[in-house]
Structure formats: C-alpha cells, structure tokens
Amino acid sequence: MSGGKYVDSEGQLYTLPIREQGNIYKPNNKVMAEEMNEKQMYDAHTKEIDLVNRDPKHLNDDVVKIDFEDVIAEPEGTHSFDGIWKASFTTFTVTKYWFYRLLSSLVGIPVALIWGIYFAILSFLYIWAVVPCIKSFLIKIQCISRIYSICIHTFCDPLYEAIGKIFSNIRISMQKEI
C-alpha cells in the first residue's frame, strides 16, 4: 500500500507512510519520474533500418559472399586472353548483381511475407503454447521429484551406506616374496 489509513484492533487510526519511491504507476520521487521519461519506447514498425550495412549481425559472411575469384580461377600456365578474362569478370559480376536485384524485387516481398507469417506463428506458439506447457510440466514433475527423492533417501541411502561400511573395512596388504 502506498499511503492510506487503517484502524487497528483497539480503534486507533493510523496513517501509513507513503513509500519513498512511490508506486509503479505514479513515481513519488523525481529520480524515478525522470528515469521513466528518459526511457524511449522503440517500436519495431517505426525503427530506422540501415541501408548501407544490411547485414549488421554478419549472418551471411561465409555463405553467400561469392565473388568471381571464388568461382572461376585459371591456374598458372593456363591463362585465357586478358580481354576474355576481363569480359568474363564483368559479365559474371554484372549478371550476378542485376539478376539478384531482379529476383529480390520479384520474389523478395512474397518470401518476406511468408517468413513474417512463419515467425509470427512460431512466436505465437512459443509464447502461448510451449512455455505454458513447459511450466505446467515443471509443476507436475516437481511433485514427482519430491516423491522420488523421499524414496531414494528412504530405501537407497541406507543400502548404499551399509555397502560402504562393509567395503570400508577391507584392508589389502601386499607382500613381496623373494
């Protein structure tokens, strides 16, 4: 309670002191009010995206970073004409660049829609089905684990303790006979 009045069993009226930090809805002190105002709310729908660095987490560094030299290489001693090599390089690079752009413009939005739906369903199932099932299972298994623990302590602990005492009295002596 963050302030108020109550009557004790003898009929005395007491006022409760207001907590120094206030409650969670209306902070009482200025420090908490400033902290709450400083926190900026980030909306996933309005955040800015980086158009220069489009892979900030480096997901595709070793997968799709394929250049001309990674695909086509002429070993020492078997070289084509320099003009052919330059034209091949240009053709490969430009074709890869523009065909990727064409494919991403035609198929990118539908695939993004499909992946968005997929991850929305996955998030929904995880939040509303998986986590509650796991919590429910842990609550149920806790009862079983207590019963199991009692059984182990009741039946197995004395048995293993007795076996330990039996084997603790075994003495081995080695003699070397010449």
Curated annotation (Swiss-Prot):
Residues 105-125 dip into the membrane without crossing it. Residues 2-104, 126-178 are cytoplasmic. Residues 131-142, 167-178 are annotated as: Interacts with SPRY1, SPRY2, SPRY3 and SPRY4. PROSITE patterns: CAVEOLIN. One of its GO terms (biological process) is receptor internalization. Residues 149-160 are annotated as: Interacts with SPRY1, SPRY2, and SPRY4. It is found in: Golgi apparatus membrane; Cell membrane; Membrane, Caveola; Membrane raft. Belongs to the caveolin family. This is Caveolin-1. The gene is CAV1.
